[in-house]
Regions:
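Divalent metal-binding acidic/histidine catalytic loops
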Residues: 1-145
Length: 145
């Protein structure tokens, strides 16, 4: 997906075939099981399932073009001599220009292999980037407990 594209733009027309958009985004969601590199972009597009516009359809097609351009980017699990668990988190402060809510995410590695990941829009608006990061870290602790 392009940087700084306005997916919330009301200038473009609504799609005639909403079902086609929903089917494509649904298939992309299924594909995120093995392609974590598209998870965030697909998550953003899934926010427009109720009223997709032409700009959303174009962004979905660009994700398909990206997938086609780099076919070997899926998950590959390798045997390492250890089973250390590493967890990383991050939060994008006020990432959603529609409602200014932050997006937090995390990924878990066991033995150097990615096993879980998640990206989610936070439920409340954070007042600072530190608060958004703290919420992301708290979410991970609750998820792993």
């Amino acid at each position: 997906m392009e940087v700084n594209i306005d997916l919330w733009c009301d200038d473009t027309s609504l799609l005639d075939d909403v079902g086609r958009y929903r089917r494509l985004v649904g298939k992309l969601i299924y594909l995120t099981v093995t392609r974590p590199d598209i998870t965030f972009a697909v998550g953003v597009l899934s926010r427009f399932m109720h009223k997709p516009r032409e700009v959303n359809w174009t962004a979905a097609l660009k994700i398909l073009a990206y997938i086609k351009s780099c076919p070997g980017k899926g998950l590959l699990y390798k045997k390492h001599g250890h089973t250390h668990i590493s967890i990383f988190s991050d939060a994008g402060y006020t990432g959603d220009i529609g409602d200014r809510k932050s997006t937090s995410g995390f990924c878990t590695f066991i033995g150097g292999n990615l096993v879980t990941w998640r990206s989610k829009k936070q439920d409340v608006v954070s007042r600072s980037s530190a608060e958004a990061e703290y919420r992301a870290m708290t979410h991970i602790v609750c998820e792993m407990a």
